[in-house]
């Protein structure tokens, strides 16, 4: 009997590698962080079989599929699965519903002396499992008295850095691959909404399994770049207690320069590519900056880029960063804080907030 498993919790907690035998176009729409796309059929083959299925039915589509994936095509694909299994002996495989494609892949591997477990219900069942857990976890946290802390603070105060020092934190911006502002994009694209939800659900499950008594998240908006936090989970952590990270202006300027200039430039092939991205980001907030301030910031930015090119130093970028922080981001932050009027349970500098949140874990 061919082995199957729907022990999705074990897959998540053990981070078991998965072979996704769906076509690349399906994989791109949504998958799992531990999955590797080694398809049974490529996009063109899948489309051809799909058309045949609609026109001639199931049996003819199956026959066509076997003709398309003949020995010449089959052998390198089986070899790819075998190589993956040699590297990850505990690997499992799946297709969309745990049906014919994963059964065929499983049988072909068995014919070559390799036994592999396939996911019962496939991608669809695993995805449903994760979404259900993301829905029920807030209630479970409440029932078990697990406290959520929303970490707030002005732009550049080091919230993400602080999160990375805590064992009981989840970095939503990290999962979304976006720093949550007009300048927050990375060279690598953001995950799809589906992938973000899948990864968030796994992060929450792993957090819960560690037995912490509190969860710390950055005080985010509903949308982080192009992805959004699922409503049930968002409402839950927004209802948590508030802690505020404070930092003097010059420290915030320095942190912002390191993250948005120095580290950001390292992601791009050339400094010019980064400059193009930054000019586009300035353009996205031009209306909110106002014409005069926009021109002033852009002039400081151009001067900083020229100075960096000449001296290989980054310090001149502090001038435009300081303007953005004090004249753009800080007023927006003050407005939002006044609008929310939420109780701040604790506030302090980096070390004080870190110590406080560590004690809550």
From Swiss-Prot:
PROSITE patterns: RHODANESE_3
Active-site residue list: 95
Annotated InterPro entries: Rhodanese-like_dom, Rhodanese-like_dom_sf, SelU
Keywords for the protein's UniProt record, in alphabetical order: Selenium, Transferase
Catalytic activity: 5-methylaminomethyl-2-thiouridine(34) in tRNA + selenophosphate + (2E)-geranyl diphosphate + H2O + H(+) = 5-methylaminomethyl-2-selenouridine(34) in tRNA + (2E)-thiogeraniol + phosphate + diphosphate; 5-methylaminomethyl-2-thiouridine(34) in tRNA + (2E)-geranyl diphosphate = 5-methylaminomethyl-S-(2E)-geranyl-thiouridine(34) in tRNA + diphosphate; 5-methylaminomethyl-S-(2E)-geranyl-thiouridine(34) in tRNA + selenophosphate + H(+) = 5-methylaminomethyl-2-(Se-phospho)selenouridine(34) in tRNA + (2E)-thiogeraniol; 5-methylaminomethyl-2-(Se-phospho)selenouridine(34) in tRNA + H2O = 5-methylaminomethyl-2-selenouridine(34) in tRNA + phosphate
GO MF term list: transferase activity, transferring alkyl or aryl (other than methyl) groups; tRNA 2-selenouridine synthase activity
Coiled-coil regions, chain positions: none
Rhodanese domain location: 12-135
Highest taxon above the source species: Bacteria
GO biological process, one term: tRNA wobble uridine modification
Keyword Transferase set for record: yes
E.C. no: 2.9.1.3
Enzyme class (EC, first level): transferase
NCBIfam families from the UniProt entry: PRK11784.1-2, PRK11784.1-3, tRNA_sel_U_synt
Family: Belongs to the SelU family.
Its biological purpose: Involved in the post-transcriptional modification of the uridine at the wobble position (U34) of tRNA(Lys), tRNA(Glu) and tRNA(Gln). Catalyzes the conversion of 2-thiouridine (S2U-RNA) to 2-selenouridine (Se2U-RNA). Acts in a two-step process involving geranylation of 2-thiouridine (S2U) to S-geranyl-2-thiouridine (geS2U) and subsequent selenation of the latter derivative to 2-selenouridine (Se2U) in the tRNA chain.
Alphabetical list of HAMAP family matching this protein: tRNA_sel_U_synth
Quaternary structure note: Monomer.
Name of this chain's protein: tRNA 2-selenouridine synthase
């Amino acid at each position: 009997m061919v082995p199957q498993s729907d022990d999705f919790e074990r897959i998540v907690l053990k981070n078991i590698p998965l072979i996704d035998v769906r076509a690349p176009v399906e994989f791109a729409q949504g998958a799992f962080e531990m999955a590797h796309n080694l398809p049974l059929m490529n996009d063109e083959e899948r489309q051809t079989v799909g058309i045949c299925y609609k026109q001639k039915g199931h049996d003819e589509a199956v026959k066509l599929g076997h003709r398309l994936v003949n020995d010449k095509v089959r052998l390198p694909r089986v070899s790819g699965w075998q190589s993956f299994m040699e590297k990850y002996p505990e690997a499992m495989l799946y297709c969309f519903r745990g049906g014919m494609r994963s059964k065929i892949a499983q049988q072909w591997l068995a014919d070559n002396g390799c036994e592999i477990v396939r996911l019962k219900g496939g991608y669809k069942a695993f995805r449903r499992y994760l979404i259900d857990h993301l829905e029920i976890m807030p209630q479970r946290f409440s029932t078990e008295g697990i406290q959520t802390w929303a970490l707030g603070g002005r732009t550049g105060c080091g919230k993400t850095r602080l999160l990375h020092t805590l064992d009981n934190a989840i970095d939503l911006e990290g999962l979304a691959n976006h720093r949550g502002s007009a300048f927050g994009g990375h060279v690598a694209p953001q995950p799809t909404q589906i992938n973000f939800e899948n990864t968030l659900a796994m992060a929450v499950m792993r957090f819960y399994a560690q037995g912490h008594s509190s969860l710390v998240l950055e005080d985010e908006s509903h949308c982080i770049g192009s992805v959004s936090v699922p409503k049930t989970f968002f409402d839950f952590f927004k209802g948590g207690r508030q802690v505020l990270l404070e930092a003097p202006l010059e420290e915030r300027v320095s942190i912002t320069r390191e993250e948005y200039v120095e580290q950001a430039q390292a992601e791009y092939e050339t400094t010019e590519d980064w400059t193009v991205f930054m000019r586009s980001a300035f353009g996205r907030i031009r209306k909110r900056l106002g014409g005069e301030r926009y021109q002033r910031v852009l002039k400081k930015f151009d001067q900083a880029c020229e100075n960096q090119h000449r001296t290989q130093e980054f310090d001149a970028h502090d001038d435009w960063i300081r303007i953005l922080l004090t004249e753009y981001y800080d007023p927006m932050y003050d407005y939002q804080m006044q609008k929310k009027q939420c109780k701040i349970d604790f506030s302090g500098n980096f070390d004080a907030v870190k110590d406080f949140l560590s004690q809550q874990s």
